[in-house]
């Protein structure tokens, strides 16, 4: 198993069938081994998602209370059109970066006409720190992957962002995106898997 990444606790799958039905699924244990409890007789490990970002501090925006849905990072999406139906489906594990990265991938697909593989491989930006208690209060950064042009980085700095250039995409802070697009003109599907982590795009 040399070379395989063993860090991480979130998995995601996106799929589209021949009739255009789509699923975007994401599951996470939250911390390593989740709640460290299994459902008896099943081997299913329970997550500790509530314990990762919800607080017992009165008045905290993510305070645990009855009838509340605490903020969490899981984010899967399907993008469709009122006239055409399904256009794109995707997901991107990676903690607090998920919403940020999914929006960037979706923008590449919708606003810039990228293919799914192009969209998931493009450099990404990440606002940091996230919401985990161990990073709250850390200095604000805008982490930028390699490949963003110097003019863009300069403009971000002019706008007041504390730009931090990360050295590498692979295994870096950009998550592990995947996407599938449906071309209604010719009835074909195209898929992309992020080069940052292990993943694969398959036609079955």
Q: What function would you assign to each model-found segment?
A:
Residues 3-167, 174:
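Proteins synthesized as precursors that undergo proteolytic processing into mature forms
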Residues 151-204:
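In a subset of proteins, long, contiguous C-terminal domains/tails are tracked
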């Amino acid at each position: 198993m040399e070379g395989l990444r063993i860090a991480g606790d979130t998995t995601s799958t996106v799929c589209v069938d021949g009739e255009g039905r789509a699923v975007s699924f994401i599951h996470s244990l939250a911390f390593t081994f989740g709640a460290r409890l299994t459902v008896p007789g099943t081997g299913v490990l329970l997550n500790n998602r509530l314990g990762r970002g919800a607080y017992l501090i009165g008045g905290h925006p993510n305070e645990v209370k009855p009838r509340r849905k605490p903020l969490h990072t899981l984010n899967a999406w399907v993008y469709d059109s009122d006239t055409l139906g399904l256009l794109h489906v995707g997901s991107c594990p990676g903690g607090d970066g998920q919403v940020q990265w999914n929006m960037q991938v979706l923008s590449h697909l919708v606003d810039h006409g990228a293919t799914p593989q192009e969209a998931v491989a493009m450099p990404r930006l990440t606002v940091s720190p996230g919401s985990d208690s161990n990073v709250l209060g850390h200095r604000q950064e805008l982490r930028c992957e390699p490949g963003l042009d110097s003019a863009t980085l300069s403009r971000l700095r002019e706008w007041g962002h504390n730009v931090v250039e990360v050295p590498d995409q692979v295994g870096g802070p950009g998550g592990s995106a995947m996407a599938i697009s449906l071309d209604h003109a010719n009835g074909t599907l195209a898929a992309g898997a992020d080069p940052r982590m292990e993943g694969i795009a398959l036609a079955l």
